[in-house]
Swiss-Prot record:
This is Orotidine 5'-phosphate decarboxylase. InterPro entries: Aldolase_TIM, OMPdecase_AS, OMPdecase_type-2, OMPdeCOase_dom, RibuloseP-bd_barrel. It comes from Corynebacterium glutamicum (strain ATCC 13032 / DSM 20300 / JCM 1318 / BCRC 11384 / CCUG 27702 / LMG 3730 / NBRC 12168 / NCIMB 10025 / NRRL B-2784 / 534). Pathway: Pyrimidine metabolism; UMP biosynthesis via de novo pathway; UMP from orotate: step 2/2. The lineage of its organism: Bacteria, Bacillati, Actinomycetota, Actinomycetes, Mycobacteriales. The keyword Signal does not apply. Belongs to the OMP decarboxylase family. Type 2 subfamily. The active site is at K95. The gene is pyrF. Keywords: Decarboxylase, Lyase, Pyrimidine biosynthesis. It comes from the Bacteria. The keyword Cytoplasm does not apply. One of its GO terms (molecular function) is orotidine-5'-phosphate decarboxylase activity.
Amino acid sequence: MTFGEKLLNAASTRGRLCVGIDPHESLLTSWGLPVNVDGLAEFSRACVEAFADTVALVKPQVAFYERFGSAGFAILEETIQTLRERGCLVVSDAKRGDIGSTMAGYASAWLDPASPLSSDAVTVSPYLGFHSLDPVFELAEQHGRGVFVLAATSNPEARELQDQQNADGVSISQQIVDQAAALNAPYMAQGKAGNIGVVIGATLSKPPRLSTLGGAILMPGVGAQGGTASDVDEIAGDMAHLAFPNVSRSILATGPDIAEMKNSVAKNAADFPGFPRS
């Protein structure tokens, strides 16, 4: 089964919300936790308890674990494994991007079932060229895992690069979406969602066209950054059933109380229901 189909199945019962696990320093402090490995472990444990049975897609931000070295990665491994064991799909927000054997190494780290960091999906950067990511696409195809390619992100700095156009007037972000769509096309022809998704900001005034993507859309920018449910639907258009808005800040702000975080998840998820599956 493709990652896209797994995600649609999960969303049919849990909704289309993606919740981030972002244990940055100020949040650890606001939770009354020490800014060290112990604080990281407790933060992650609370997030697992709050999200594992309620959310379709959870997105740990790898950088906040990586900063603590091997001990941080050990906590990330446990977090990913526990979430997946309890029925969540996990996208590791690593934003990796390289070429050749190095990219293959990143692919194995995040998508190979034998890896201790094995996730359902991973975020990647296409800056070195879309097909520099072929090793991760190939492993995703082999194991039914997902890849989210950065396409049109919500940070203002992105516009100077992602909005640049080629000689035919097609923006870089649109080219990325179109190339992802080409990889998903065989599945879309069968009425299925493919393995290759894109990252599209929910606050964009001129987003790329997504009507032929045929894969999942990870949409940061909802909530604290100003994006709304109507923005998500408008940008995603015909692919709205595959749009998964990422909400992190407002939900994590209700921690460390697990019940409060669950309540916040329920309130946010109500705006993004899943669709019944036959």
